[in-house]
Swiss-Prot record:
UniProt keyword Transferase, yes or no: yes
Name under which the protein is recorded: Protein-L-isoaspartate O-methyltransferase
Family: Belongs to the methyltransferase superfamily. L-isoaspartyl/D-aspartyl protein methyltransferase family.
Keywords of the record: Cytoplasm, Methyltransferase, S-adenosyl-L-methionine, Transferase
Location in the cell: Cytoplasm
Residue positions of the active site: 62
SUPFAM superfamilies: S-adenosyl-L-methionine-dependent methyltransferases (SSF53335)
GO biological process: methylation; protein modification process; protein repair
GO annotation, cellular component aspect: cytoplasm
E.C. code: 2.1.1.77
Amino acid sequence: MTRVALTSAVNLAKKLHDAGIRNQAVLKAISHTPREMFLDNALAHKAYENTALPIGQGQTISQPYIVARMTELLLHKMPQRVLEVGTGSGYQAAILAQLVPQLCTIERIKGLQIQARQRLKRLDLHNVSFKYGDGWLGWANRSPFDAIMVTAAASTIPEALLSQLAEGGVLVLPVGEDTQQLMRITRTADRFSSETIETVKFVPLINGELA
């Protein structure tokens, strides 16, 4: 990470703190992650702006505030094994991989998955397992998960993901179509409780796979 990038990432973390992010581990991960690595060169100059940016294939890299907020919500109970649905650029996975012992991440667009895998390898993040597949289905043979994060908006809460949560586990995801709400769902035995956190805007969670 260059000195300029490090300074920019540290300044971004300070802005996120001012915006309400309080988890110091999350802020530290943000400050140590070169966001420009996850963007095309043409957009690298915008890497440390607090905004979502396009990454191709109709997808985006999420606004840093949302990355930090969802991570903060996910870390509420110190999960050991985490599933991310929607690898995308790999930026959210890079943040999570610095904070949890084991991360599994699914991406339905093959090209994005390949790029993300290469980026995390360059960052020496080796506690991540990648899967090319349909995020609506989760990753059953790696379950149960202590926490699941979905980085695209589901029209309804995927039943497969609920079934793959460990007891006491949390699912953090945006739900809705035109109007979306960020939610945190907690599993207690066979019951689920939900919290609505805030209004958000994500690309839709689409089923199936795309080469």
